[in-house]
């Protein structure tokens, strides 16, 4: 249920007070009464049955003639006007009931009739309710409607009387000649077919009926004139269009239909601020808005409110045609109901191509048309000569397959206007450049933001070869770079989901029936044809919605929409042509203040300057605004806040080591400021360290000291020149003489003692954490030292460093879920690599005997203290080695990296109190078999020969989960991960893993069922792994085939079959040892930090 709006201006539309339903109830009662009058007027039987209650009502409460079609119509119109909350209807009903009440009171006094007294009391209560409910009848009628209605009534009665007199003269019956005119006047004006004793005869019977009908028509016309709602002129003024164009320029980049708001046979209403507007047209009492509001989304609610207020003033039902999801949400918040109307077809030109099975029909059509010598020409309207544009207009009219131009929310309704120079014309030309050049098709598209177009007009010469439209659309998409277009909005498919889902096997009976109905009406309205013409291009579908006030209004809204879109054509009676090229509005809707302040133009051209309400970025906190004001002051004073480089002479660390009296120039970030009046102390930091800067008025003067204090804020980048000395307390300081701003910091720094305390903020603002947190700097320095050590150590061993592809067609080299991406140039899905292994092995086949790579890999897995979706890996391969040789090298690499970071073979680990403590990792490290480590934990014998049943029992006893489809290798490895890996502390090598779990590893040379593979684990984290690589191409093919079957079965981590790798392996690879190490985890091990702390920019959660 919709909650009432907070804005009081909308309150009356949503008010649920005790009198809010009076208009509806009174209209309902009189509507039922009018039906009864109509029925007993045409049915003598019903008139006889209801005679007693009819006469009672007629005598005391409300006129109820026995035969009066005109009265039935009048009451029906009054009922409709009351239900529409028209104030004039309230006046008529209240006065009418007041007159009857006075008559009853008089009769009560004179005749003492109790029925008159009861009726008077009842009517007084009714009148009291009507008076109390007067504010609910707020709808206006047209200005001067009462006088116009009186004129229509008198004129209509006069004409009807003259016609009736003629009929009486033709068919007089026994009526005397001198009474015939009076008879006609009586019957027309009384509007009742009853006898009158004044006359001495009667004309023919049917004459009475005709005369009564003529009177009813005159009365009906008068009442309709009185109750008719205010009419909209459905037109823009030049200033209105100018303001709309300004809004589109600044806020219309995301709305494909925004430019259609400049269509000139619409009216417009603006938000009071002028920041947003709604264009609309009124048809049969429905105020039909087209698409989303134009302008600043923050002002949309105010524009919608103004639009609803306008509609409520004149009794219009409100509806919206073709709103986007964003727009529909805004209208729904304003109280409208929302129904998905269909979908808009959007082509992303960078993704469009004619390849693939789905595009075969379009590809064939394009090829067929090209054989006829048809080419495509694209021009902006501004580049088209006037004579060519005149020919375009003629062709558009001649080739139109309907009598009138269709479209309202998604059509511009004009061609050749000088203000539409950014529109795009796409022409299919036969024999281009020759004397026989002939245009056989054309598309006209309006601008959609800076890099899109939206289809306005589509024409095809009746004799053109089939496929001309497909050629134009495909050429527009594939040659879009020539015109700077990246997105194209095609036609709108009404009820697309019905056509799509209803034609599928298994569609329900209701859906099939609904589709059949739409297909039937498609004979006239091309509903299915629009869907078929769009779906062939494989577009993205963007939903469009119909918004409306009440379900009871849906039929009228649908009919009004059909009129507006041109599907239903009403008789002209002076209606304007759909090709509106001039401004016909007489009253500007744009707020008057904007006309002068924004430089609007009466010819509809865009404003001279950007509107003053355009946004210049996010709303700034007060402290940021203060700093930005300082930035502006610096600019006014001619001081460059972001100057060109002037390198310092010393780093801060070097300056601090310089002898006292040394002249230096340092640069860094201002972290602390302490102002003691005549002297200011500041702390400045660069990457090498911190130093205190002393600014003394005795050295620089009071004025410069004041300038320094006023100019600089915490966080600013500063360059200071001076001499090394000491403060009065003997603290080493740089005695400042000169300074300049190197960069103004526009945001305040965090607390100088706590820094960034929130972990997510530290990740999101990593640059700030590094600038303020010495530990973060130390970790990055340690990481750099570790990576450099790994690279230097391998280089010293004769390894060559290479780079292999990150984008790969097949994901392999490890069991992990990959990230998927797409290359538009080849219309090909690609993976971000999960490992460089298979490419490095190709190089081993090529003869590279020692090769390594340090690079990024990507795995679509969880994020925690030891996992990040992207991380750095080291992989190294050495011919004529094995996993034991890789074990020695791995240990030596890590020990050398520890020396590079700390100068000794130590690592840092958190102690019991959370403080980091040193751990010696020199010498040999423990080596255990995987099965032996599991057996050690369980206290029972576990080996590669242990049966599947025994392993399952051990898992059940120790609450280790497993799947019934797993083999012994998978279960044994699951036990290892639960019992061993998580509880390992000191670096340990675990060897001889199950062969079934190692698809790229050589089987053990002497132990069946296991492979020559080890994992290095420390403090619950796997640091690296190494194999004796599998070089048998036949065995390797069998294993990867098995993996590909798992992948096909839905295992996201199983490797795919890489035929190129297998073909390379079939050329023979020497016996090789392979090593893989997680560089981030090695840094974690050495520094004692988490994986997030060791990365410069770890992945952060999305902003809320």
UniProtKB/Swiss-Prot annotation:
Chain positions recorded as Mg(2+) 1 binding sites: 1015, 1022
Region annotation (Lysine--tRNA ligase) ranges: 609-1104
Gene Ontology, cellular component aspect: cytosol; plasma membrane
GO biological process, one term: response to antibiotic
Assigned keywords, A-Z: Aminoacyl-tRNA synthetase, Antibiotic resistance, ATP-binding, Cell membrane, DNA-binding, Ligase, Lipid metabolism, Magnesium, Membrane, Metal-binding, Multifunctional enzyme, Nucleotide-binding, Transferase, Transmembrane, Transmembrane helix
Region annotation (Phosphatidylglycerol lysyltransferase) ranges: 1-608
Cofactors, names only: Mg(2+)
Ligand binding (Mg(2+) 2): 1022
DNA-binding region boundaries: 664-739
GO MF annotations in UniProt: ATP binding; DNA binding; lysine-tRNA ligase activity; magnesium ion binding; phosphatidylglycerol lysyltransferase activity; tRNA binding
CDD domains registered for this protein in UniProt: LysRS_N
Residue stretches spanning the membrane: 25-45, 64-84, 90-110, 117-137, 151-171, 205-225
Membrane topology category: Multi-pass membrane protein
Cofactor: binding comment: Binds 3 Mg(2+) ions per subunit.
Pfam families in alphabetical order: LPG_synthase_C, tRNA-synt_2, tRNA-synt_2_TM, tRNA_anti-codon
Swiss-Prot/TrEMBL catalytic activity: tRNA(Lys) + L-lysine + ATP = L-lysyl-tRNA(Lys) + AMP + diphosphate; L-lysyl-tRNA(Lys) + a 1,2-diacyl-sn-glycero-3-phospho-(1'-sn-glycerol) = a 1,2-diacyl-sn-glycero-3-phospho-1'-(3'-O-L-lysyl)-sn-glycerol + tRNA(Lys)
Compartment(s): Cell membrane
Region Disordered: start-end pairs: 600-621
E.C. number: 6.1.1.6, 2.3.2.3
Known role: Catalyzes the production of L-lysyl-tRNA(Lys)transfer and the transfer of a lysyl group from L-lysyl-tRNA(Lys) to membrane-bound phosphatidylglycerol (PG), which produces lysylphosphatidylglycerol (LPG), one of the components of the bacterial membrane with a positive net charge. LPG synthesis contributes to the resistance to cationic antimicrobial peptides (CAMPs) and likely protects M.tuberculosis against the CAMPs produced by competiting microorganisms (bacteriocins).
Similarity field: In the N-terminal section; belongs to the LPG synthetase family. In the C-terminal section; belongs to the class-II aminoacyl-tRNA synthetase family.
Name assigned to this protein: Lysylphosphatidylglycerol biosynthesis bifunctional protein LysX
Organism annotation: Rhodococcus erythropolis (strain PR4 / NBRC 100887)
